[in-house]
């Protein structure tokens, strides 16, 4: 790989370097200042925003639900990558010289793969949870313990996938500078790095996005393409509306990730088509822009949560209540308002000519109602023809942010 790609690449520095060449990528000071400001925005926004997301969930007992644990894992992975890799990657890309030693060279090439893997498979787990909750509501849901086990498995697989790149990373002293690079085992066709590169790209991008796309397509057809019965209860309308809002929010999260990382993956597939492209002097600016877009994916989720979810918005307002231009809202009063199902009941609705079943099953110790006004009906008419009914007992308990989120 040529100079700029060898030193710049976080995830796939997989092309050999001509180490005899001097550093040809030198930028004027004003460009460095602009890029530094742009990358600083990512670090500050991502770290602060994702830490607040973790606080909103973990500091409020009823936010500690199955799906929200995956959101905590997602926030942790993104905040960690922003904190540990963004600044280092920027300085390396700008100066084309490695200042941080062998250990951090290995970590710098190792951790981003693990973090991206953990991020995208946390989103996949959320998509699977939404799929099961809406398409197969009568099936058993993950317990809190099982959810933590799944998160641990995600990280174990992430670390295993990233291990080869960290293991083969090394520093090399050139005539005027030190570079961080990956020395793959010798092979005439560089088969090891090519296979690894393709496997990583498939596993951390195309495969999970394919699974997520299928899950949300089926969920979307169920929630939007089906006709809501005209005589169904207000509670049913509220639940369907709430589920739609949640799915919309998660689709925005996934699409944002896909858009941010697509140019990055395309960029590192180009050496197999036109290796000489990386010898162009303008390629450093292209790389800085592409890397900024990829790294910026770590800062958007807190903004999306705040914009599209009332409870997260309230949590952010409370977290930043000391700011003079932010109204904290009725945080204390809102904590006293929540409606939760205490009995596990199946609410089955026959929807549209396809007889699509949309069931709502709420665990006695787990999920809570999502959006909409909180009511306490003693009996609900559950089908379009009124032939099936189920009594649901409810009671008012203290507020949970999650009552607006992902039941």
Curated annotation (Swiss-Prot):
PROSITE patterns the UniProt entry points to: G_PROTEIN_RECEP_F1_1, G_PROTEIN_RECEP_F1_2
Keyword Transmembrane helix: yes
UniProt keyword terms in alphabetical order: Cell membrane, Disulfide bond, G-protein coupled receptor, Glycoprotein, Lipoprotein, Membrane, Palmitate, Receptor, Transducer, Transmembrane, Transmembrane helix
Region Disordered, annotated ranges: 365-394
InterPro entries associated with the record: GPCR_Rhodpsn, GPCR_Rhodpsn_7TM, Neurokn_rcpt, NK1_rcpt
Protein known as: Substance-P receptor
Function field: This is a receptor for the tachykinin neuropeptide substance P. It is probably associated with G proteins that activate a phosphatidylinositol-calcium second messenger system.
Lineage summary: Eukaryota, Metazoa, Chordata, Craniata, Vertebrata
TM stretches of this protein: 32-54, 65-86, 107-128, 149-169, 195-219, 249-270, 284-308
Regions of this protein lying in the Cytoplasmic compartment: 55-64, 129-148, 220-248, 309-407
């Amino acid at each position: 790989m040529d100079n700029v790609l060898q030193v710049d690449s976080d995830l796939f520095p997989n092309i050999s370097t001509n180490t005899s060449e001097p550093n040809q990528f030198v930028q004027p000071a004003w460009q460095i200042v602009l890029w530094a400001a742009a990358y600083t925005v990512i670090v500050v926004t991502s770290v602060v925003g994702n830490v607040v997301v973790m606080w909103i969930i973990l500091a409020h007992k009823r936010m500690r639900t199955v799906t929200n644990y995956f959101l905590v894992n997602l926030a942790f992975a993104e905040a960690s990558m922003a904190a540990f890799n963004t600044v280092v990657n920027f300085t390396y890309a700008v100066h084309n010289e490695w200042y941080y030693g062998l250990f951090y060279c290995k970590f710098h090439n190792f951790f981003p793969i693990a973090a991206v893997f953990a991020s995208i498979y946390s989103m996949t787990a959320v998509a699977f949870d939404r799929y099961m909750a809406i398409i197969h509501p009568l099936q058993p849901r993950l317990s809190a313990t099982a959810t933590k086990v799944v998160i641990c498995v995600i990280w174990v697989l992430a670390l295993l996938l990233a291990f080869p790149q960290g293991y083969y990373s090394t520093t090399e002293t050139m005539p005027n500078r030190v570079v961080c690079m990956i020395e793959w085992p010798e092979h005439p066709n560089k088969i090891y790095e090519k296979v690894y590169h393709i496997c990583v790209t498939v596993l951390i991008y195309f495969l999970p996005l394919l699974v997520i796309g299928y899950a949300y397509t089926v969920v979307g057809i169920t929630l939007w393409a089906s006709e809501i019965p005209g005589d169904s209860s207000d509670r049913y309308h509220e639940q369907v509306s709430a589920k739609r809002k949640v799915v919309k929010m998660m689709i925005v999260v996934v699409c944002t990730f896909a858009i941010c990382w697509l140019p990055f993956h395309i960029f590192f597939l180009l050496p197999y088509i036109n290796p000489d492209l990386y010898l162009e002097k303008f390629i450093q600016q292209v790389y800085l822009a592409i890397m900024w877009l990829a790294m910026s994916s770590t800062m958007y989720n807190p903004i999306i949560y705040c914009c599209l979810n009332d409870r997260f918005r309230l949590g952010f307002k409370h977290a930043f209540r000391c700011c003079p231009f932010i109204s904290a809202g009725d945080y204390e009063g809102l904590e006293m308002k929540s409606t939760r199902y205490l009995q596990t009941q199946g609410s089955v609705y026959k929807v549209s000519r396809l007889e699509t079943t949309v069931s709502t099953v709420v665990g006695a110790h787990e999920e809570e109602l999502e959006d909409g006004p909180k009511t306490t009906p003693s009996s609900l008419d559950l089908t379009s023809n009124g032939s099936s009914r189920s009594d649901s007992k409810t009671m008012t308990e203290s507020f949970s942010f999650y009552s607006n989120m992902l039941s």
